[in-house]
């Protein structure tokens, strides 16, 4: 995952393949910089490409704790004025995309047990429509009350580079307004649906005063 700070600053953050065993994850971690873990579904084997077994999740968390990683919220990383600060060495943050119900029911209790902060990137259309497989606004409010934080993930979860830029702007503003209305928040970090961006979208995020954006970036 790459996190872009607009106004020129660029921070590269390594994306761990979270479907691997804890031993293989350990080999993939960058001990000299910040690592961001990205999850989607928890204990939903029907969706193997985005699911993680919660027993494997526990192994990931225990490895990081036992090896004394500096586990912080993603906002703590992004708010560092000097992105080369030694603070980033062995620093780790956790994010979850989409607000699937399985995160709230299966994943979040584990993160809470280990006292680990999580940023949840919320696609608002499915929440607003009360989709059965996604969190509700009440559950999102509970998540925030219990220490979680939220970021922007568009309203529609569409593949944005394929959209007209005016339609993207309408989509993003709708999402921002709903999050402010329902959660009382004005997030400044955005995760691109499907991890893909374009120069036009980057310019639009600047226009909307969204300071950071997450791109999908895989490493060998």
What are these regions (language model features)?
Residues 2-10:
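Bacterial N-terminal signal peptides that target proteins for export
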Residues 10-21:
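Bacterial N-terminal signal peptides
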Residues 21-92:
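N-terminal pre-catalytic segment of deacetylase/amide-hydrolase enzymes
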Residues 32-47, 87-92, 100-200:
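Metal-dependent polysaccharide deacetylase catalytic core of the NodB/CE4 family, i.e.
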Residues 72, 119-121, 151, 211-214:
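Structural detector of well-ordered beta-strand residues that form the stable sheet scaffold
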Residues 170-172, 201-213:
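Short, electropositive alpha-helical surface patch
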Residues 217-220:
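Conserved small/polar residues in nucleotide/adenosyl-binding loops
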